[in-house]
Amino acid sequence: MFNFFAAAPKGFEYSLASELKEFGATDVKESVAGVYFSASLELAYRITLWTRLASRIVLVIYKGACDSAEQLYNAAYCIDWPSHFSHKKTFSIDFHGTGGFINNTQFGALKIKDAVVDRFRDDGTPRPDVERVNPDFKIDAHYRNGQLTISMNFSGASLHQRGYRSTTGEAPLKENLAANMLVRSGWQANPITVLDPFCGSGTVLIEAALMAADIAPGLKREKFGFENWQSHNKAMWQVIFDEAQARATLGKTRCKLKFYGSDIEPHLISIAKRNAENAGVAELIEFSVSDALDVTPPVSEGFLISNPPYGERLGNVTELLQLYYQLGDKFKKEFGGWKIAMLCSDVELISSLKLKADKQMKMFNGALECAFNIYTLHANSTRRDVPELPEGVDIIDIAPAFANRIKKNVKQFEKWAKKERIDSYRLYDADLPEYNVAIDRYVDYVVIQEYSAPATIPEAVTKRRISDVLLALPGALGIHPDRITLKTRERQKGANQYQKIDERKVEVITEEYGAKFKLNLTGYLDTGLFLDHRVTRKLVGDKAKGKNVLNLFAYTGSASVHAAIGGAKSVTTIDMSNTYINWAKENFALNGLSGAKYDFIQADCLQWIKDNSHQKYELIFIDPPTFSNSKRMEDSWDVQRDHAEMLGGLIKLLSPNGELIFSNNKRKFKMDIEALNQAGIDVTNIDHLCLPLDYKRNPHIHNVWLLTHAKK
């Protein structure tokens, strides 16, 4: 008897242990990401050829305590390596684990390599060569909690590589994961017709066909690790291999099951057909190009097993939520009598099926933790009538109170927006407390900003409500899900502060009181235009005629554009971000504005104020951040703490009869009027003049003040 370890993805341990016991292995013991077992050489060959779940099988040669580099070397040296592989064969060492005296895996591998070549040399045999890429003989070593295990890679390359895959789609499903889905779903114990409406390159269906036809998954492999092992019994292996080939021939003849696969991508169906041909099961599987929502049950009872798309694979979250909801609806209506098994990494997506699971399990697709849910469908439900909507949009009867509020707001704001000559506005701002989001309409697109939920509300409840918003919104607005983007508004730290939200790039041009602006709806948290400052920007434009205008903390220069269109004599636009300065230049070009009178400066605005007190402007607009500790700034900035000092310096740049508009978005901001008056500055609050209709639900969104030199 030999001792082995069968490695597998995390979460496979129970299934793999059961499989090994069925093969006849003894001393079966589950471990993390694998199972220990004992077997004869003949059984080990069979397991290696027939296992559908293991990734790798290693023959354990040494196992014991190890506390020093010397012990590591001695343990490896004591192994009779010349009895395991010839000096004419190349070898490599995979070392896993660190701790104690082992700081890195390279050190451990080097020590074992030295011991191996020294053992060959001391036995009077030429030393074998090391080959890292494709060695003849692989040694596996693991070090954990002071225990060292040295093994021979018995199986060779990962066993999930069956040998039939020609190429893959965007998000390939490993063969042993597909097999485990079939095992854990209960299908393997009671095989019936299988349907996969998101079949991709066909892996689930091919694995099911291999099981049903009694075809060993290792038959197509070209190489196994034991082939260069000195104790390899070629005759025994050949008998086992020939037996498996005979079983495959007979199994395909006897297999009466049919398998059905479809995918919306024609090139994936071509790959799936090629893979099935390579696996020898093409005649058992019927592939077709089809949208999953158009697939119908090929038989009255069957098993739908699939790995549909989720966020890590492809797609916009709103589209995916819609897809999952529509799938669940379709399953209930058309798949009565079927079982459904779905693998998905996103709990909210799989919850959007709105089906009650018989079983809920966890599986790992690589490092990605996934939910694997099993459903039994009974009587069909009746189809509901829906009103006429744009293609791709579905009315979803979820969150009716929210949907009704959206419809009400659309009626209120559409006429107003047209009258105001704007096509971007806030449609909804946490009007209903349980749906704690802001929804902005940008031309024909919608951006949802999720506010941070109170700590008292469970995360699962928050996620469900967001899912309901995303599901209900397309129908309520009559727009396609791909025109909806979700962003999370919460406290950001470090590198996450400006993390890109969406891999898609959606840019639109919006119009506002005759001005045009470029928006990026999916790049960074902010789109390039603060809608709450719309009226303030118009005020700047109305006051700008014939004046020298200064715009500080200018962002993308939208207030500068209004000033230029309003007839400013000159406009100076300053921001610390070069990205925003370039964006401002684009906005000017978009409006046909060019010339020497428009100046763009990338600078620390606070330092620039100090360095340019000699300059004079008739109109100044400044909208600083609430807080900043940018590395480009010498000191941190807090608008409450520092505004009086900053405005006291800025007033020096204001001409005698000039006006300074100061705005910020700090809630509970308190203007230091006394300090400013002492500095010779008159201060007037103009919030009521600068609050747009679409922000009247949230009157504290910003603070706007008009400052002038005190009258003498």
UniProtKB/Swiss-Prot annotation:
Query: Per its UniProt entry, what is the enzyme's top EC class, as one word?
Result: transferase
Q: Which UniProt keywords apply?
A: Cytoplasm, Methyltransferase, RNA-binding, rRNA processing, S-adenosyl-L-methionine, Transferase
The UniProt GO MF terms for this protein read: 23S rRNA (guanine(2445)-N(2))-methyltransferase activity; RNA binding; rRNA (guanine-N7-)-methyltransferase activity
Q: Enumerate the spans annotated as THUMP domain.
A: 43-154
Q: Where in the cell is it found?
A: Cytoplasm
SUPFAM superfamilies in alphabetical order: S-adenosyl-L-methionine-dependent methyltransferases (SSF53335)
Q: Which domain of life is it from?
A: Bacteria
The EC number(s) this enzyme carries: 2.1.1.173, 2.1.1.264
Pfam families recorded for this chain?
Methyltrans_SAM, RlmL_1st, THUMP, UPF0020
User: Which is one Gene Ontology cellular component term of this protein?
Assistant: cytoplasm
- PROSITE patterns, sorted: THUMP, UPF0020
Catalytic reactions on record: guanosine(2445) in 23S rRNA + S-adenosyl-L-methionine = N(2)-methylguanosine(2445) in 23S rRNA + S-adenosyl-L-homocysteine + H(+); guanosine(2069) in 23S rRNA + S-adenosyl-L-methionine = N(2)-methylguanosine(2069) in 23S rRNA + S-adenosyl-L-homocysteine + H(+)
Q: To which protein family does this belong?
A: Belongs to the methyltransferase superfamily. RlmKL family.
Function noted in UniProt: Specifically methylates the guanine in position 2445 (m2G2445) and the guanine in position 2069 (m7G2069) of 23S rRNA.
Q: Known NCBIfam families for this protein?
A: PRK11783.1
Looking up PANTHER family in the UniProt record yields: RIBOSOMAL RNA LARGE SUBUNIT METHYLTRANSFERASE K/L (PTHR47313), RIBOSOMAL RNA LARGE SUBUNIT METHYLTRANSFERASE K_L (PTHR47313:SF1)
Instruction: List the protein's name.
Output: Ribosomal RNA large subunit methyltransferase K/L
Give the source species: Shewanella frigidimarina (strain NCIMB 400)
Q: What is this protein's gene name?
A: rlmL
